[in-house]
Regions:
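Type III/flagellar secretion export determinants
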Residues: 1-220
Length: 220
């Protein structure tokens, strides 16, 4: 049974009262917790699912957990402060959808991907990349219900930009491999628009059109 413990002296004096009793609910109400709210119900459900039966908690812990849900009971990421980024049964289909995203986000990704490609000689370095900042900036521009799809769309552009850089370097040096020096000026003629114009949607992906009009999957 979920119990209340150590919330102010009053709660300490009557520690152990069942949270689902009338007295327990009255105490929660006096502490500013609406036990009829969707956030409260979501917290109780998640806490019950996390253990066999229900464990122990205190009022402040419940308040903290409730603050992690918005009015629609969508989880708010403590990292980004945004909702709509956790895959659930409700939004699962969104994570593989392609949608229109701001041109500014595509510009930001192109410029950063190019800079890091040159700095790391084409090696993807998860320790130093700042691309997560580009995604966060995008999510902040999007409606909550479009954030998963926007992230998927930006990933497709990110892959396309990186592949275009690889192709450009290999056009100059066919034996080039990631980690080897990149020939000076190898990426000078590449623009974001030139890459974007070659991409078409195929299901939940963006693929490159060939000269014949067919599509070519991008592999990076």
């Amino acid at each position: 049974m979920l119990m209340i413990r150590d919330f102010s002296n009053r709660f300490q004096q009557i520690s152990g009262m069942p949270i689902n009793s009338k007295g327990g609910k009255d105490m929660l109400k006096r502490a500013g917790i609406d036990t009829n709210s969707k956030q409260y119900q979501a917290v109780m459900k998640s806490m019950s699912a996390a253990c066999s039966g229900v464990g122990y908690t205190n009022v402040q812990a419940i308040k903290n957990r409730m603050s992690r849900y918005d009015k629609d009971v969508d989880y708010i990421s403590p990292v980004t402060g945004l909702a709509g980024l956790v895959v659930t049964e409700k939004n699962r289909a969104e994570k593989n959808r392609i949608i229109d995203i701001p041109e500014s986000s595509r510009d930001e990704m192109f410029e950063l991907a190019k800079k890091e490609f040159l700095q790391e000689n084409g090696v993807g370095n998860g320790d130093t990349t700042r691309r997560s900042d580009v995604y966060l900036n995008l999510y902040q521009k999007m409606d909550k219900n479009d954030r998963l799809a926007a992230g998927n769309t930006l990933r497709q552009y990110e892959r396309a930009y990186t592949q275009a850089f690889v192709d450009a370097v290999k056009a100059i040096d066919p034996k080039w491999e990631p980690g080897k020096p990149i020939p000076s000026g190898a990426l000078d003629g590449i623009t974001r628009e030139s890459i974007d114009n070659l991409l078409v949607q195929s299901g939940g992906s963006l693929v490159k059109k060939t000269s014949s009009g067919s599509t070519l999957d991008i592999q990076v």
